[in-house]
């Protein structure tokens, strides 16, 4: 836990940015571009104490647990004692709780999913606020897979644009008309290739050229 994942580029990735093993992570200002390729993934939220903010997700095609965004149902409570840890599988999903998801942008994605996955531990104290969802050529892509997520999640002042100005009919989402150029300007927020990646990997010139081309 306590990881910071900030200002990275995920391009045509079939692997997601997943908060699974650990708590209190910061997922901030990342760019995820799926280019409409099959089974591309976005951000999957499980466990507790995360902040997910200012991320840009575009043309991701996955659904359910592989959607552009997913808040997953939990299988276990967060362990508190040594006995809890011994009884729990390492790959388990803890209840999602105490999470802020705010100021993110989703463009032309197939689905944003709330409540998918096996398990009966619904989220608690989760806020999805001030996010932008732009999919003008499709019907509303916000899917509530499990209604027991309420009242554990609150949607606050989110803005969306769908085909024919159709509404998702979920409290906390407002229909609007976006300036697409302003929306897509956020895809350039990833840092320069020289500043990307792990501290132990030196970026080669060929990698710099490729990453720069992807962002233009």
What are these regions (language model features)?
Residues 1-195:
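Glycine- and acidic/polar-rich repeat regions and solenoidal domains
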Residues 186-216:
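Active-site and glycan-interaction determinants of carbohydrate-active enzymes
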């Amino acid at each position: 836990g306590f990881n910071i994942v900030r200002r990275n580029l995920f391009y045509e990735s079939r692997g997601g940015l997943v908060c699974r093993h650990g708590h209190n992570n910061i997922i901030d200002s990342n760019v995820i571009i799926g280019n409409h390729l099959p089974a591309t993934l976005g951000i999957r939220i499980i466990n507790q104490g995360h902040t997910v903010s200012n991320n840009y997700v575009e043309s991701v095609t996955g659904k359910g647990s592989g959607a552009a965004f997913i808040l997953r149902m939990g299988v276990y409570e967060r362990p508190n004692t040594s006995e809890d840890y011994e009884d729990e599988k390492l790959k388990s999903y803890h209840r999602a709780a105490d999470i802020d998801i705010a100021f993110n942008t989703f463009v032309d994605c197939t689905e944003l999913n709330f409540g998918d996955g096996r398990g009966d531990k619904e989220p608690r104290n989760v806020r999805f606020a001030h996010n932008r969802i732009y999919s003008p050529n499709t019907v509303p892509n916000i899917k509530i897979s499990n209604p027991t997520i309420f009242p554990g999640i609150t949607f606050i002042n989110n803005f969306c644009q769908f085909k024919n100005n159709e509404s998702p009919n979920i409290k906390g989402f407002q229909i609007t008309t976006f300036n697409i150029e302003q929306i897509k300007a956020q895809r350039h927020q990833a840092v320069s290739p020289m500043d990307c990646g792990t501290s132990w990997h030196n970026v080669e010139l060929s990698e710099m050229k490729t990453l720069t081309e992807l962002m233009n």
